[in-house]
């Protein structure tokens, strides 16, 4: 538990971005979210909770770009599957052993722009290919 007395399953770093921007970037950690600027949020790890997913679903943001670390591909796909019926979703796979902070904002955004939005069937195919 953190200083609020809550576990990480109730935390979303930069939560307000969900209500301020049409597009948000979901990262694992706060440093990665900060690298992407005001639209970056963090789930405080690769695992995510039902509470965190519901907060994202209930928010007015329309586009969700998932940028978890390379060792979390399965978690990224699982999160996308939770969100794809409610939001437009991109899953951006980062180069091995690199996270958003390692790449920097400019290189990360190039990857984002070169990644297409995914439908449910695309995510299922991707999940089955891992």
Outline where the language-model segments fall.
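Phosphate-handling DNA/RNA-contact segment within nucleic-acid enzymes
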Residues: 1-60
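A generic structural motif
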Residues: 89-99
């Amino acid at each position: 538990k953190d200083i609020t007395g809550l576990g990480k399953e109730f935390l979303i770093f930069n939560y307000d971005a969900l209500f301020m921007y049409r597009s948000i970037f979901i990262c694992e950690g706060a440093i990665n979210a900060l690298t992407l600027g005001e639209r970056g949020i963090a789930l405080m790890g690769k695992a995510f909770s039902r509470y965190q997913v519901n907060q994202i679903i209930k928010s007015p943001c329309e586009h969700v770009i998932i940028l978890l670390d390379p060792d979390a591909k399965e978690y990224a796909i699982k999160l996308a599957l939770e969100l794809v019926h409610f939001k437009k979703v991109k899953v951006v796979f980062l180069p091995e052993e690199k996270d958003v902070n390692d790449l920097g904002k400019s290189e990360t955004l190039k990857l984002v722009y070169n990644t297409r939005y995914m439908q449910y069937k695309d995510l299922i195919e991707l999940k089955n290919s891992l």
